[in-house]
């Protein structure tokens, strides 16, 4: 599901010079430098006879996946994930999302180059929790989630963090292709588009990768996960529509809060009822354990906005993912100031 190490684009180092949050900046700069200094060539690690078989298998899978991303999908792999860094913990960063309680409006953090981003990743987990607490005191909903990886958008040769190796083969290949997709196409101030595009490329790319390897079982596993992602996308989109109607009514605070909670309760019932029966790869109970509020809903939607639109575009290109990515890149490059999702909508029949 969304979260985990689903691909995270954060400006942890890019904001160093302009950020006023000194403690955050210093910790981010230190941790990024530590990760970069800890890099070791995966090719050299594979030459080490002392390397354990599990890691050897995963490292080979990573190199094969990034080569596939570059050579078969035309993605800008560069030197991303040709190195490995041991980070010494299970979670790389803790990500904070905030949103107003009376409207589906995210709290935005602004960084150079990447623009406004509706989340903030912390290496210092206590600082992440403190930030969430401060937002809550200001009346915001908050949501905290772990992430096992992030992308510097090609500014640095991102190493594979050891946290990523906690994933299974299917999830690891999706992560590699997802993060390389960020290197390939990134639209400032358009996080839902950027993450939904990368999620689409990650899963459809992983499916093509395993099919090319003759591993039909893992390819079908990827397809099942992607179908579940699209089901959840529809579920969250419906909930967004209901909440937008509630907030547009401009009720006083007390009845609005009652109605809001009732909407969330009914959504949980749908999740554990009709939707649970449709899910193929995800466990509905685990999905339902995630808190539902405006912040968590927006965090989920960041990765699951109009994902079926990407699939329709893939169908228009005869299932050719490389051609689809190329068409999307060309259209986005020529979009001017139009919303990227509006651009995509013009590329498929209605």
Per-range role (PLM):
Residues 29-31, 155-157, 284-286:
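Short, motif-level signal for alpha-helix interfacial/capping segments enriched in acidic residues
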Residues 65-229, 241:
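Acidic/His-rich structured neighborhood in mature extracellular/periplasmic domains
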Residues 1-87, 280, 304-350:
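N-terminal low-structure segments adjacent to metalloprotease catalytic domains
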Residues 13-45, 163, 170, 195, ...:
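Metalloprotease/metallohydrolase-associated module, dominated by Zn2+-dependent proteases
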Residues 234-350:
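Pan-zinc metallopeptidase signature
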Residues 13-15, 103-104, 178, 278-283:
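Short hydrophobic/aromatic-rich motifs at helix boundaries and adjacent loops
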Residues 35, 48, 55-62, 121-128, ...:
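Solvent-exposed, acidic/flexible segments
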Residues 47-51, 64-74, 181-185, 202-214, ...:
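Sec-exported extracytoplasmic/periplasmic mature domains
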């Amino acid at each position: 599901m969304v979260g985990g190490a689903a691909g995270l684009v954060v400006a942890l180092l890019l904001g160093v010079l302009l950020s006023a949050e000194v403690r955050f900046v210093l910790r981010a700069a230190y941790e990024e430098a530590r990760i970069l200094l800890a890099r070791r060539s995966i090719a050299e690690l594979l030459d080490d006879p002392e390397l354990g078989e599990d890691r050897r298998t995963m490292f080979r899978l990573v190199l094969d996946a990034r080569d596939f991303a570059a050579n078969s999908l035309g993605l800008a792999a560069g030197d991303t994930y040709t190195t490995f860094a041991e980070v010494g913990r299970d979670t790389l960063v803790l990500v904070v999302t905030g949103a107003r309680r009376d409207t589906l409006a995210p709290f935005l953090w602004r960084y150079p180059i990447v623009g406004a981003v509706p989340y903030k990743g912390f290496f210092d987990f206590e600082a992440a929790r403190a930030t969430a607490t401060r937002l809550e005191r200001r009346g915001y909903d908050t949501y905290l989630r772990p992430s096992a990886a992030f992308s510097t958008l090609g500014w640095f040769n991102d190493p594979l963090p050891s946290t990523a190796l906690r994933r299974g083969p299917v999830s690891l290949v999706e992560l590699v292709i997802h993060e390389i997709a960020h290197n390939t196409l990134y639209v400032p101030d358009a996080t839902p588009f950027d993450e939904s595009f990368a999620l689409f490329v990650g899963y459809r790319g992983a499916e093509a990768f395993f099919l090319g390897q003759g591993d039909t079982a893992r390819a079908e596993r990827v397809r099942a996960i992607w179908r579940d992602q699209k089901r959840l996308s529809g579920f969250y989109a419906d909930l967004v529509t209901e909440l937008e109607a509630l907030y547009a009514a401009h009720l006083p605070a007390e009845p609005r809060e009652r109605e809001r909670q009732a909407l969330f309760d009914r959504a949980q019932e749908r999740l554990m009822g009709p939707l649970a029966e449709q899910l193929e790869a995800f466990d509905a109970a685990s999905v339902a354990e995630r808190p539902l509020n405006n912040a968590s809903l927006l965090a989920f939607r960041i990765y699951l906005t109009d994902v079926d639109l990407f699939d329709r575009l893939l169908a228009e290109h005869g299932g050719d993912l490389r051609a689809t990515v190329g068409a999307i890149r060309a259209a986005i490059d020529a979009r001017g100031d139009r919303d990227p999702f509006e651009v995509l909508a013009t590329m498929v029949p209605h």
